[in-house]
Amino acid sequence: MKTKIIVIVGPTAVGKTALAIEVAKRFNGEVVSGDSQQVYRGLDIGTAKASPEEQAAVPHHLIDVREITESYSAFDFVSEAKMTIEDIQSRGKLAIIAGGTGLYIQSLLEGYHLGGETPYEEILAYRASLEPYSDEELAHLVEQAGLEIPQFNRRRAMRALEIAHFGQDLENQEILYEPLIICLDDERSQLYERINHRVDLMFEAGLLDEAKWLFDHSPNVQAAKGIGYKELFPYFRGEQTFEEARESLKQATRRFAKRQLTWFRNRMQVTFYQIGESGVQDRILSQIEEFLDD
């Protein structure tokens, strides 16, 4: 019997953390971060971690589990998330995955057998190589490979091509979870306004000092490549004014949000909710209750 879990995804600044905490309080749950940057200690503001008060109110996992000099991959996330979910379930609680790193969350839900002969990085690279293809081009590749896909869609086509490419190593995947995947969204203009406002609040909270600390200590590590830090490095090098760097960060974050939405729309089976609609939280909570009672 598969473990039921709640998954909350969506673009940056849309309110995933607040909803995850509300769901955890309502359904006796704990939050597992699905964010590739929140694993790093010392990077709190730019990664929009839950506040100490929020983390005290509801247990959070996979936050502050790496030093900034350490690497972190989808392989690491899947391995650690599986152990964390098992621990949460063993205590009779509900696991709530919340974050915006679509690759990590999809890899967890699709249950790739990470101990197989095919290196996980090869699987991810092949998957990324398929992303630029249109639906028609993917359909042609499927036909060329002699594959049959009832009710064609991108997700099924790409999955079939991956299995055909790598063979049994992928076919022997282990699906452990029955997820309800909720994707929060907002009107584009409203979302961009939220992003711009949150960036301003981050600067008020000390983002510049946090980014300067990272720049001074480890400017070339994986942790420094995330949105929220590298956009400020030209300012520290004297190549941009502060206002130029701040606008660059806002623009990069808006573009990132657009890419996130594209991923969730094309690669995962989600239920979309517009956060600006009246009564949306009550409808989400009702759907979760029905899912858990089923």
Curated annotation (Swiss-Prot):
Annotated signal peptide: none
Cofactor(s) annotated in UniProt: Mg(2+)
Keyword line: ATP-binding, Magnesium, Nucleotide-binding, Transferase, tRNA processing
Binding site for substrate: 12-17
Residue ranges, annotated region (Interaction with substrate tRNA): 35-38
Family annotation (Gene3D superfamilies): P-loop containing nucleotide triphosphate hydrolases (3.40.50.300)
Site, as annotated: Interaction with substrate tRNA: 101, 127
Catalysed reactions listed for this entry: adenosine(37) in tRNA + dimethylallyl diphosphate = N(6)-dimethylallyladenosine(37) in tRNA + diphosphate
Binding site for ATP: 10-17
GO MF annotation list: ATP binding; tRNA dimethylallyltransferase activity
GO terms classed as biological process: tRNA modification
Domain of life: Bacteria
SUPFAM superfamilies: P-loop containing nucleoside triphosphate hydrolases (SSF52540)
EC id: 2.5.1.75
UniProt similarity note: Belongs to the IPP transferase family.
Subunit structure: Monomer.
PANTHER family (alphabetical): TRNA DIMETHYLALLYLTRANSFERASE
Function summary: Catalyzes the transfer of a dimethylallyl group onto the adenine at position 37 in tRNAs that read codons beginning with uridine, leading to the formation of N6-(dimethylallyl)adenosine (i(6)A).
Name this polypeptide is given: tRNA dimethylallyltransferase
